C-alpha cells in the first residue's frame, strides 16, 4: 500500500508551542489508527559514519517524563531517556552506511533507513508520524510528516533520542578502529579536530566521499568548507 499523508493536514506549519505531547497520536487513534509510531533519524549532516533511524511506539500509560528533541537534551539525559524508552516502548532501529549514502544520496538513504525501522517494529504500526517533510515510501500504513516533529510529538521525540544515542555509540566504537579522527568526540561532524584528522591522514572507509568537502580531499587537503553543524 502506498503511504499517504493526512488529507486535512499533510504537513504541520502551525504556530503551536514547540513542546512535544501526545495530541497527534491521540488524533490518529480517534481516526481509527492504532498503534501509532513516531520515526526520526540522526546523522544526516556528518562527513563520516551512517545515518541511523528509529521507530518508536510508546505505551500511553508509561511515557517517560522529559521527552524532547534530542538536540535539546544533554548527552547524559539522552542516555537516561534511551534506557527508559527501551524499557517501556516498542522500538526498532535501522541504519544506512556511508557506502549506501554515497551510492544514492543522504535523503534517500535516510528515508530507506526510516522505512526499514518502521517495517521492523515487533508490533506493526497502523499510522506513522515522521519528523520533517517526508513519509518514507514503501510503508504498509499511512503516515504524516510533521515539521519540527521531534519538538511536537513525544513519539517522534523518543525516536530522535533512540537514533541519536545509537549513532553516538556507533561512532564511539568507530573511534577505536579509526582513532586518528576523533569520532568519539564529534561523531563524524565537521569540527576542527575532524578537519585536522582528514588533512593529516586522508579519509577512511567511514567517510562519505560523495559529500563535497570529501570529494575535494581526494585531490588535495582543502578543508575550508567543512563547517560544523
From Swiss-Prot:
Cofactor details (free text): Manganese or magnesium. Binds 1 divalent metal ion per monomer in the absence of substrate. May bind a second metal ion after substrate binding.
A Pfam family per the record: RNase_HII
EC number: 3.1.26.4
Main location group: cytoplasm
Region (Disordered): 209-229
Keywords (A to Z) from UniProt: Cytoplasm, Endonuclease, Hydrolase, Manganese, Metal-binding, Nuclease
Residues in RNase H type-2 domain copies: 34-223
Cystine pairings recorded for this chain: none
Entry superkingdom: Bacteria
CDD domains: RNase_HII_bacteria_HII_like (cd07182)
Record-level GO BP terms: DNA replication, removal of RNA primer; mismatch repair
Residue stretches in coiled coil: none
InterPro entries per the UniProt record, alphabetical: RNase_HII, RNase_HII/HIII, RNase_HII/HIII_dom, RNaseH-like_sf, RNaseH_sf
Cofactors that this protein relies on: Mn(2+); Mg(2+)
Top-level class of the enzyme under EC nomenclature: hydrolase
Cell location: Cytoplasm
Record GO cellular component, one term: ribonuclease H2 complex
PROSITE patterns: RNASE_H_2 (PS51975)
Purpose: Endonuclease that specifically degrades the RNA of RNA-DNA hybrids.
Family stated for the protein in its record: Belongs to the RNase HII family.
PANTHER family from the UniProt entry: RIBONUCLEASE H2 SUBUNIT A (PTHR10954), RIBONUCLEASE HII (PTHR10954:SF18)
Identification of the protein by name: Ribonuclease HII
High-level lineage: Bacteria, Pseudomonadati, Pseudomonadota, Alphaproteobacteria, Hyphomicrobiales
